[in-house]
Amino acid sequence: MPGKKSPYGLFAGGKLKKKRQKFRWNDVTYKRRMLGLAEKYDPLEGAPMARGIVLEKVGVEARKPNAAVRKCVRVQLVKNGKVVTAFVPYDGGLNYINEHDEVIIERIGGPEGKSLGDIPGVRFKVVKVNGVSLWAIWRGKKQKPTR
């Protein structure tokens, strides 16, 4: 009669628990969470928002089946110097952003921290320009301050 894979008995709980723990490392999401890989390679370093300087305006082509040029900006983060692409929301929102403006960016809210919808490789969006909400500027409620 061949041996059993798992111990069984009144005091086998510790051994079973230890064995389960060992096999959890085969799960990709568990491994990434335990090793802190999301924070390690995150440009925002775990923070909800970040401040940056606009380097250039870029147009990102939308994924199929859509045919559009999504307006984005390349932003260099102040905290670590990393350069990321951020989506500019609202119709004509790019008109209120110039190069060398200071912007606040946040995550765009895609699944698993990835890009959202038909915008490939863009994981962030612009929230504020020169300390004023982009939405307020776009609505005409506030004026964009000149620096």
From Swiss-Prot:
Record carries keyword Nucleus: no
Alphabetically ordered keywords of this record: Ribonucleoprotein, Ribosomal protein, RNA-binding, rRNA-binding
RNA-binding keyword on record: yes
GO biological process per UniProt: translation
Subunit: Part of the 30S ribosomal subunit.
Top-level division of the source organism's lineage: Archaea
Record protein name field: Small ribosomal subunit protein uS12
Gene Ontology MF terms: rRNA binding; structural constituent of ribosome
GO CC annotations on file: small ribosomal subunit
Cited SUPFAM superfamilies: Nucleic acid-binding proteins
Database matches in InterPro entries: NA-bd_OB-fold, Ribosomal_uS12, Ribosomal_uS12_arc, Ribosomal_uS12_euk/arc
Family per record: Belongs to the universal ribosomal protein uS12 family.
Signal peptide positions (record): none
Species whose genome carries this gene: Pyrobaculum calidifontis (strain DSM 21063 / JCM 11548 / VA1)
Pfam families: Ribosom_S12_S23 (PF00164)
Gene label: rps12
Function per UniProt: With S4 and S5 plays an important role in translational accuracy. Located at the interface of the 30S and 50S subunits.
